[in-house]
Swiss-Prot record:
GO annotation, cellular component aspect: cytoplasm; membrane
Keywords assigned by UniProt, alphabetized: Cytoplasm, Lipid A biosynthesis, Lipid biosynthesis, Lipid metabolism, Lyase
Pfam families: FabA
Known catalytic reactions: a (3R)-hydroxyacyl-[ACP] = a (2E)-enoyl-[ACP] + H2O
One function term, GO molecular function aspect: (3R)-hydroxyacyl-[acyl-carrier-protein] dehydratase activity
Localisation per UniProt entry: Cytoplasm
Active-site residues annotated for this sequence: 56
Protein name, entry field: 3-hydroxyacyl-[acyl-carrier-protein] dehydratase FabZ
Annotated signal peptide: none
Amino acid sequence: MVAATTLEAVDIMGLMKLLPHRYPFLMIDRIIDIDGDDSAIGIKNVTINEPHFQGHFPEQPVMPGVLIVEAMAQTAGAICIRSLGASKPSLVYFLTIDNAKFRKPVVPGDQLKIHVKKIKKRGNLLKFACEALVDGTKAAEAEISAMMVTGD
């Protein structure tokens, strides 16, 4: 049985309605689960066609860690904006990265499963615990904080 607070998955078209990011900086392809405004699981399919692989590194392409963290932040941002509803234009500003650890290289062909869980909220400030997994193995983790700004 699905919990009453669980919302349906969000495909790429839905993400483009929620997030202001576009190619080449939209770092998530879909969200497969959102539990209210508390947690989400995002998916990033890593492909060799992404522009950062031209220079990082041409002979041994590895997804830059900062882009993995950005994928975490975008997944968290989708939770925040989705929780406000479509009637309030809003942005989510990325504020801090704490305790970031990169445990396994992420390479073209990998699928990142990004788990984001809200651990603190005070007014419009939020903190999230994040993990990025490849085939069930932790590739990266971080705590991030963000600020929601509504159009009110």
